[in-house]
């Protein structure tokens, strides 16, 4: 009988355990404390290739996944993801599609062709539905195309508006999305694992309090550690590293749309202006994934924009890590350019480029990314 290598090793360990006459303490392997190698980012005004502005759809009480009846049409809402639309898209799609379980309808409509609409449409197709997307804009003209793409469910709700019911929705959506994206990690979808370094000048990383939903989400990130002084390659005193995923919107949204069309999904470019027009669609099961558009379409005045401005530098393939901080700045190394942020201007509807913000973001990122300052 042939023994596998794993079986042989298991047997050997068992044999050694049986031969032991006393307990021997096991010493953990000592992790070498070498400085992380990070390629410098060439942050110069001359390397800027574009700056874009987007409005994220924020609700202080959190995203809305709920049912509403319009005459003989059932609308399932799925919008208001704040700064985590890409991050949470598969998770809230799972919640929304679950609300249709047991209904007889097998033909449905999805309103919106951003990341939330496409994710919802794909999950519906995978469960046997025939889906038509109605949308005002298609990629690359959606709000989702003006997103960073770092998997991190942040700026989703106000702490003082958190309810036990939403907390559970939020945790469930985060966990589901984190698992689903792992199945898509590939060049085809523009999804990859990268180390992300959280940079701070004020103190080391502190785990979320137990009452925070992030206490259940933070353990999802693998290979997390606070870097010691000898390991820290950045000119700030406190650096926390963990692994997460970068989802590149330009690649990812096109791939999702391609999957949808290959599965015989239909897209109709059409703007719907009122609930009456929604109720007039031939499909009587409708998923509303219109983001900030739900404010006017369904009268949700809780929706408010969070303005974000992103500046891109020429690509640097050798940069294979992300940074967040200090403060509100961040850097993501995408194929379409080195993305530098950021701004989080709540309640601001202006989509005009702000030159002073460009200079601030360049200067603050250059201070921590332009090369090693430690010997």
Q: Can you say where each PLM-predicted feature lies in the sequence?
A:
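Short beta-strand to alpha-helix junction loop
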Residues: 84-88, 166-173, 240-255, 353
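Active-site substrate-recognition segment that forms the wall
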Residues: 24-71, 80, 84-94, 115-127, ...
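Glycine-rich active-site loop/strand segments that organize a redox cofactor
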Residues: 138-173, 229
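Flavin (FAD/FMN) cofactor-binding and adjacent substrate-gating region
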Residues: 11-15, 53-72, 144-146, 183-259
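N-terminal secretory signal peptides and thylakoid transit peptides that target proteins
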Residues: 1-15
């Amino acid at each position: 009988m042939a023994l596998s290598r794993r079986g042989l090793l298991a047997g050997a360990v068992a044999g050694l355990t049986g031969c032991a006459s006393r307990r021997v303490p096991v010493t953990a392997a000592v992790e070498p404390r070498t400085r992380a190698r990070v390629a410098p980012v060439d942050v110069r005004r001359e390397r800027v290739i574009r700056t874009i502005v987007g409005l994220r759809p924020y609700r202080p009480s959190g995203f809305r996944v709920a049912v509403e009846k319009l005459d003989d049409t059932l609308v399932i809402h799925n919008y208001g993801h704040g700064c985590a639309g890409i991050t949470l898209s598969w998770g809230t799609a799972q919640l929304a599609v679950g609300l249709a379980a047991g209904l007889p309808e097998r033909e449905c409509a999805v309103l919106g062709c951003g990341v939330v609409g496409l994710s919802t449409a794909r999950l519906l197709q995978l469960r046997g539905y025939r889906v038509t997307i109605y949308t005002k804009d298609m990629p690359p003209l959606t709000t989702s195309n003006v997103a960073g793409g770092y998997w991190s469910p942040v700026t989703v709700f106000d702490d003082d508006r958190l309810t036990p019911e939403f907390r559970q929705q939020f945790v469930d959506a985060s966990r589901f999305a984190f698992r689903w994206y792992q199945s898509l990690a590939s060049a085809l979808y523009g999804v990859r694992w990268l180390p992300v370094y959280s940079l701070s000048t004020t103190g080391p990383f502190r785990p979320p309090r137990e009452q925070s939903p992030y206490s259940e989400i933070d353990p999802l990130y693998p290979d997390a550690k606070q870097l010691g002084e000898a390991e820290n390659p950045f000119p700030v005193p406190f650096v926390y590293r963990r692994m997460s995923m970068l989802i590149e919107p330009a690649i990812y949204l096109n791939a999702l749309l391609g999957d949808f069309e290959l599965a015989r999904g239909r897209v109709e470019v059409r703007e719907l202006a009122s609930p009456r027009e929604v109720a007039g669609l031939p499909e009587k099961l409708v998923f509303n994934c219109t983001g900030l558009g739900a404010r006017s379409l369904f009268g949700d005045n809780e929706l408010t924009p969070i303005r974000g401005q992103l500046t891109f530098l020429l690509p640097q393939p050798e940069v294979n890590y992300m940074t967040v901080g200090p403060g509100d700045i961040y850097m993501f190394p995408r194929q379409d350019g080195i993305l530098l942020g950021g701004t989080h201007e709540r309640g601001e509807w202006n989509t005009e480029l702000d030159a002073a913000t460009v200079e601030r973001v360049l200067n603050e990122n250059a201070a921590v990314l332009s090369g090693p300052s430690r010997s």
